[in-house]
Amino acid sequence: MDIQKLYNQWLEKATEDADLIPELESIKGKEDEIFDRFYRELEFGTAGLRGVIGAGTNRMNVYTVRKATQGLARYVLSAGGNSAAIAYDSRIKSDVFAKEAARVLAANGITVHLYKELMPTPMLSFAVRKLHCTTGIVVTASHNPSKYNGYKAYGSDGCQLSVENSEKVLEFVDTVPMFGGAKLMDFDAALEQGLIQYIPDSLIQEYLDTIATYAIEPIKTDLKVIYTPLNGTGNKPVRAILEKIGVKNVTVVKEQELPDGNFPTAPYPNPEIRQAFECALKLAEEVPADLLLATDPDADRVGIAVADGDGYTLMSGNEVGALLLDYILSRRAANGTLPQNPLAVKTIVSTQLAAKIAAKYNCQLVDVLTGFKYIGEQVGILEAKGEENRFVFGFEESYGYNMSTCVRDKDAVITSMMICEMAAYYKGMGKSLLTVLADLYKEHGIFCCSQNSFTFEGAAGMETMKNIMASLRANPPKEVAGETVTAILDFGTRLETNTATGQQTPITLPKSDVLYYRLGDDGDNVIVRPSGTEPKIKIYITAIAESEEKAKAKSDAWLNEFKAKFN
């Protein structure tokens, strides 16, 4: 069907959401606006759905949510499943989309366990496992701006769906007509018949009680914390877990305390960026704190800023990941709770400092593709062998961490607990997290790790991103700013090429659109990959040197050379 016909069809049929028809009327005759909404269908990919809220096949709305959920329902039924758990965050229409998904699943005879109020993503993973559900859905767009929403699907293990299973769902989704293709059941009728059931508060308490068991050291110092949930889902559970372990001195940023999908004081509610901390930093001028803590809207990622004497230093995901790994291994080794053959997991784009730390404690470190599902998958592999107690920590540089086996996704609630415990422990020794990080660098070398994103909006942007990746493959660099490229790992072809000999060896990780350039022989690297959830290409750089200045100079030179390839 051509785009104009699709547009006219939506004008005629998209009447159940009062916001859609006025939007469609407002773009009449505007070819670019119509094209962007209808040039493709919002794809059910490995991260589920994510897109701008609005009218059209390329937008998040009740029709695209129903279509995706009908496909998911057919997948669940084809696998012999019969139950699902659903959670949602504070975003615009998250509650609406969650109920629409529940109606579709119930109409297909699938029992739905629905949180009655907004809830963090990790608590969806926990519910799937505890309630023995076949699948799970969380309605969220994580840290994206307020105009976005999304929909992540989970397997019975509590991990986001694997690539293989996502593709199976997509096959079913593609067979569902946009209008009238999804089965629907009245929400209240489904509640009365028990096809939709609210998840009891006892499960929320069980989650908090369970993650509290992962605390290592008792809190013995008065750690002063400023916390912001960034108008998301973290407010209640994060404060509850900190109270539970004895972190009492917590001041919450009032403007960002309550749920608000408009994110009025943080248009980009992303704990990776300084702007998300602006309100917390301002509050810290009146209420000095040792630690500033920010969780994203669905509370699966957490960022921190640490008092440095002159103000506050924001710490990166790689730095926090390295600190947590070292803290967990060192303290559990000291108190005799570290398992034999401990295992930690990180993504390939995360800091290689983790390898040095893991080696010190005879901890096996497994590298996986980007995406926390691959970390959860490794826990599942251990579980199948009865060895899940070997898992001590998993992290990715994009501020996602977990140290539990009861949740198979990144978890900002348990991580907030562990960060505060760690900060309190070191405060008792007269150290800040910045001091401890400096000690790690003295021991293992300076690791300058950076991540840079380049945005390519719309249909033209998608094509540009494909062309950039194709050009990099067709014209592999022999050197980057004077540093020899010693190996190229193309996860698209699953081949590693030794650039000196031309010898190729297979890569055992799954296929992915990632190019990994090994520079020199000291562990330096540059990695290029398109984002799986946003219209961006990301460049990850690791530069290792004996001083921060030298590492930064190398990193900047490599970044500039790759930026030139994007123009």
State the predicted function of each range.
Residues A85-Y148, K244-I304:
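N-terminal small/polar loop signature for handling phosphorylated ligands or for N-terminal nucleophile
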Residues M123-G181, P297, D308, E397:
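Active-site phosphate-binding/coordination module
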Residues S83-D89, K224-Y227, N402, T542:
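Short glycine-rich or small-residue beta-strand-to-loop segments that form or flank ligand, phosphate
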Residues F38-N58, S142, P229-P237, I241, ...:
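Conserved phosphate/anionic-ligand binding catalytic regions in large, soluble enzymes, centered on
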Residues E33-F38, L42, N149-E278, L283-A284:
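Gly/Ser/Thr-enriched, mixed-charge loops and adjacent short helices
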Residues A289-L291, R331-R529, K536-K538, S547-K552, ...:
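Phosphate-binding and adjacent anionic-ligand microenvironments
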Residues D2-A101, N108, I196-D222, T233:
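An N-terminal, well-structured beta->alpha segment
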